[in-house]
Amino acid sequence: MSQAVQTNGTQPLSKTWELSLYELQRTPQEAITDGLEIVVSPRSLHSELMCPICLDMLKNTMTTKECLHRFCADCIITALRSGNKECPTCRKKLVSKRSLRPDPNFDALISKIYPSRDEYEAHQERVLARINKHNNQQALSHSIEEGLKIQAMNRLQRGKKQQIENGSGAEDNGDSSHCSNASTHSNQEAGPSNKRTKTSDDSGLELDNNNAAMAIDPVMDGASEIELVFRPHPTLMEKDDSAQTRYIKTSGNATVDHLSKYLAVRLALEELRSKGESNQMNLDTASEKQYTIYIATASGQFTVLNGSFSLELVSEKYWKVNKPMELYYAPTKEHK
């Protein structure tokens, strides 16, 4: 294609536009007039309607004037404010919001394809909530299993240490038969050491063979830790394997509902192990509503604790003693 252009009344300048082979061969697309419907897969359609920044469906679409890429209004404005003033897709320079223009036609197209946009977003939120809940259950059960393993290792090391101490004590007693002065001196040294060992064992709230203990990480850095003695209710709990005294050390920010949920998951896990099952469905159904937490008052009565109370608040309101707080648990009547 050739074209001559006259400039300034002098000699004409010729411009030549060379067409590619594709441009020479292409023909206009025929309009569909017979009601033909073209099927498009939702996945390919969603990729066209997706914001490259948040990877969700476009909302309040904004189009760049230079490269014509589309983004959500909030996403692209935030990217320009905190980024390098460039298109997130092609890295073309965008000076400011003046390089963007709203695209109401594309928003209208999305509303035609998805007339129930609110229902779609509500469904997405429900799916995400279900996934997060499942992941939290798995993390909790994994934390309990790891805690049990660590406690078993500590128990084994304590047993070996006691055997070594007992053996060394027997050797000291054998040597004392030959020298009374040496035995008196050794007994004076061994007495305080044994006393210190016993004191540390009593104050450590460590795990027995029949009792279960669980150390829960603090919810927030710097939060005070509270030691609990978790006993079965003396009248509302049946005498079975699950009715054990449990020792817990956790954050003061933890609530009573957290304790109830931990207890439900812990007992469900112990039941699975006792039956030799590997099905984790019981853990998914564990709820904080299965167990009610009580505290004994000065009058000997048991007071039901509100599930939203933090353990620090319970300690300040009911306990007020500088020793591990004693709580009691029993199945909720509705879940018996």
Curated annotation (Swiss-Prot):
Quick one: a GO biological-process term for this protein? mitotic cell cycle
Positions of the UniProt region annotated as Interaction with HIP2: 2-179
Instruction: Specify the effect of H69Y.
Output: Loss of HIP2-binding and loss of ubiquitin ligase activity on histone H2A
For this entry, the protein name equals E3 ubiquitin-protein ligase RING2
Organism domain of life: Eukaryota
The biological pathway it contributes to is: Protein modification; protein ubiquitination
Phosphoserine found at:
S41, S143, S168
Q: What is the effect of changing K93A?
A: Mildly decreases ubiquitin ligase activity on histone H2A
Q: Which molecular-function annotations from GO does this UniProt entry contain?
A: chromatin binding; histone H2AK119 ubiquitin ligase activity; RING-like zinc finger domain binding; ubiquitin protein ligase activity; zinc ion binding
* Miscellaneous field: The hPRC-H complex purification reported probably presents a mixture of different PRC1-like complexes.
Q: Where in the cell is it found?
A: Nucleus; Cytoplasm; Chromosome
Query: What keywords were assigned to this record?
Result: Acetylation, Chromosome, Cytoplasm, Disease variant, Epilepsy, Intellectual disability, Isopeptide bond, Metal-binding, Nucleus, Phosphoprotein, Repressor, Transcription, Transcription regulation, Transferase, Ubl conjugation, Ubl conjugation pathway, Zinc, Zinc-finger
Q: Which reaction does it catalyse?
A: S-ubiquitinyl-[E2 ubiquitin-conjugating enzyme]-L-cysteine + [acceptor protein]-L-lysine = [E2 ubiquitin-conjugating enzyme]-L-cysteine + N(6)-ubiquitinyl-[acceptor protein]-L-lysine
Q: What disease is associated with this protein?
A: Luo-Schoch-Yamamoto syndrome: An autosomal dominant disorder characterized by intrauterine growth retardation, severe intellectual disability, behavioral problems, early-onset seizures, feeding difficulties, and dysmorphic features. White matter abnormalities and delayed myelination are observed on brain imaging.
The record's GO CC annotations read: cytoplasm; euchromatin; MLL1 complex; nuclear body; nucleoplasm; nucleus; PcG protein complex; PRC1 complex
Tell me what the record says results from K97A. Strongly decreases ubiquitin ligase activity on histone H2A
ZnF endpoints (RING-type): 51-91
Gene3D superfamilies this protein is in? Phosphatidylinositol 3-kinase Catalytic Subunit, Chain A, domain 1 (3.10.20.90), Zinc/RING finger domain, C3HC4 (zinc finger) (3.30.40.10)
- Briefly state the modifications made to the protein after translation: Monoubiquitinated, by auto-ubiquitination. Polyubiquitinated in the presence of UBE2D3 (in vitro).
Tell me the gene name.
RNF2
Instruction: Identify the InterPro entries for this entry.
Output: RAWUL (IPR032443), RING1/RING2 (IPR043540), RING2_RAWUL_dom (IPR037937), Znf_RING (IPR001841), Znf_RING/FYVE/PHD (IPR013083), Znf_RING_CS (IPR017907)
Q: Which organism is it from?
A: Homo sapiens (Human)
Indicate whether Nucleus appears among the record's keywords. yes
User: Where does the record place Polar residues bias?
Assistant: 176-191
